[in-house]
């Protein structure tokens, strides 16, 4: 819908109309990974019979052991929380274009270890052309 907070009634009406016109998969995303903000979206979309893709915002180098917040355990916890919330798919969004092939392998392996059967999508808005990948 956008990068702002919407009143609950607007969210509900949006999904009612989206479902009516054939939208059946919704990607929910909070750029700060504050997944409590996604709960209403997941509930409304699921109750309308839709499928929900919960999206993690990749914002830190998980290969750096000095990272205290955005490490592998952080993303594993988010993955479990999204699954418990009821999402049907999982996505990792690399908005900062900082994922390298090595780190992507490490991250995907860790997420697969938690939810081996959940579909996993990767999004690279920067076309996966990070200078760190060269």
Region spans (language model):
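Alpha/beta enzyme core
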Residues: 4-121, 134
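Conserved thiamine diphosphate
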Residues: 1
